Amino acid sequence: MSNILILDFGSQYTNVLAKKIRLLSVFCEVLTWNTPLEKILQISPSGLIFSGGPHSVYQENSPKVDKEIYNSNIPILGVCYGMQLIARDFGSEVQGGKSEFGYTPIVFYPSELFKGLVDQDAFHTEIRMSHCDSVVIPPKDFFVIASSQHCPIAAIECPEKKLFGLQFHPEVSDSQAVGDKILSNFVKHICQASETWKIETIEKQLIQSIKEKVGETERVLLGLSGGVDSSVLAVLLHNALGDRLSCVFVDTGLLRKNEVEEVKQQFSSLGLEILVVDASEKFFHDLSGIEDPEQKRKVIGAAFIEVFDEVSRNLDVQWLAQGTIYSDVIESAKSCDATQVIKSHHNVGGLPEKLNLKLLEPLRFLFKDEVRALGKVLGLPDVLISRHPFPGPGLGVRVLGEVRREYVEIVKNADSIFIEELKKANLYHKVSQAFAVFLPCKSVAVKGDCRHYGYTIALRAIESTDFMTACWPSLSREFLNRCSSRIINEIPEVCRVVYDISDKPPATIEWE
């Protein structure tokens, strides 16, 4: 298959870059920066991209590539750190200079990379910069094709070797129109990659892969959450394995309001029988006294595995299926040893090393929008496909600090009110995700002319195309007032409601 290969040097945007390329209907995969040249040549990609990263190329032991890769005749695009690496490998100097962050005016000059953007002499626009180091002089046989005020060498090219470098990130949403055009030029025009990445093809490949991996006799256990990922996975596995799939829904006590009954009803309508296991006592017991978010995630992951192990002995299953997707992997920083860890994901970083079941993750390299598209192909109803994401640890990471039953009930009711109001106002499908967070701090209020000491609820809503970057929506004063009034009046323990106005980055979507 004609494809684009990304060598990951640790950028948190690497998988956003991969998604952008897949949206061009071109297959893209990500490998670590130290992948042997022999393996890269065996893959025989149409093009290579060196990602950004947190290191400086002049640091000792900074990530490097085998320089023979430049003699492979494979077109290469370096992004940020990737551009600096190319420049250094060809004899240029990279220095820590004037940093640039945020929107920056830039000038593009004629280049194959900017085809359709630069008609004649130059094209003036704004892109988002995020760098501390800069290339001082262009390498021999390279030309400068973009400049900004504080970064005279913002992009370079060597047409003869088909080598290109960008000091900025074309994949981030802020510069979407320009960035998408640049990536399209590189992938389709320069690399001439084939458009073979289609969701219908993915469905067939995944079903075939599941059959080959599981074999003809072994059985699979799937822990349903009621979310998009596990719902799509359930139908996919059912199509591949039939009655050799056992679906278990674990009531952790950390679920959304009425979640258990809704999940039972939804999957019954899909022709799937599920076993409901009430393990809430265990989860609250195991979480008692634990305040650290990372530890909570690991405890919840371990508790899930213990429950599944116990169930599996009665069901005679050999595999545990999980709805892990690509963004889960990048959040847990497992795709590259140079990545800065943000948080562990329940499905990937929170699992104990010793697992008594073999792990099956068919959706591991699909993005959320690809999972939704797959769900449509599989015939899932819109009510499941368009549901907001819900974290694997559930409300355990929406109660800050120690998880107690009374705290969970408070945030569960507040969340239900918030979602209900979003649906009433026809806003639910206009935001990408929305939820309530319980803050374990009390503040003074006045209720019925009496002094009251109550908890605080934070409301969080975001708009995002990839869940790697996100912005907060400007919900109206009237809408937020309705939500606040209902929460404070209907939940006696709460006396204050705040609205989170933090983008990602710097904040993550979930508070923990």
UniProtKB/Swiss-Prot annotation:
Q: Which residues form the GMPS ATP-PPase domain?
A: 197-387
Which pathway is this protein assigned to? Purine metabolism; GMP biosynthesis; GMP from XMP (L-Gln route): step 1/1
Q: Which residues form a coiled coil?
A: none
- CDD domains this protein is in? GATase1_GMP_Synthase (cd01742), GMP_synthase_C (cd01997)
| Ligase found in the keyword field | yes
One Pfam match: GATase
Q: What is its EC number?
A: 6.3.5.2
Entry's Gene Ontology molecular function annotations:
ATP binding; GMP synthase activity
Q: One Gene Ontology cellular component annotation?
A: cytosol
User: Looking at the keywords, is Ligase present?
Assistant: yes
Active site, renumbered: 80 (nucleophile), 169, 171
Which residues are noted in the entry as ATP-binding?
225-231
**Which PROSITE patterns does this UniProt record tie to the protein?**
GATASE_TYPE_1 (PS51273), GMPS_ATP_PPASE (PS51553)
Could you tell me which InterPro entries the record lists for this protein?
A: Class_I_gatase-like (IPR029062), GATASE (IPR017926), GMP_synth_C (IPR001674), GMP_synth_GATase (IPR004739), GMP_synthase (IPR022955), GMPS_ATP_PPase_dom (IPR025777), NAD/GMP_synthase (IPR022310), Rossmann-like_a/b/a_fold (IPR014729)
Which Gene3D superfamilies has this protein been placed in? 3.30.300.10, 3.40.50.880, HUPs
What this protein catalyses is: XMP + L-glutamine + ATP + H2O = GMP + L-glutamate + AMP + diphosphate + 2 H(+)
**What function does the entry list?**
Catalyzes the synthesis of GMP from XMP.
- Assembly and interaction partners: Homodimer.
Protein name per the record:
GMP synthase [glutamine-hydrolyzing]
This chain's source organism reads Chlamydia caviae (strain ATCC VR-813 / DSM 19441 / 03DC25 / GPIC) (Chlamydophila caviae)
What phylogenetic lineage does the species belong to? Answer: Bacteria, Pseudomonadati, Chlamydiota, Chlamydiia, Chlamydiales
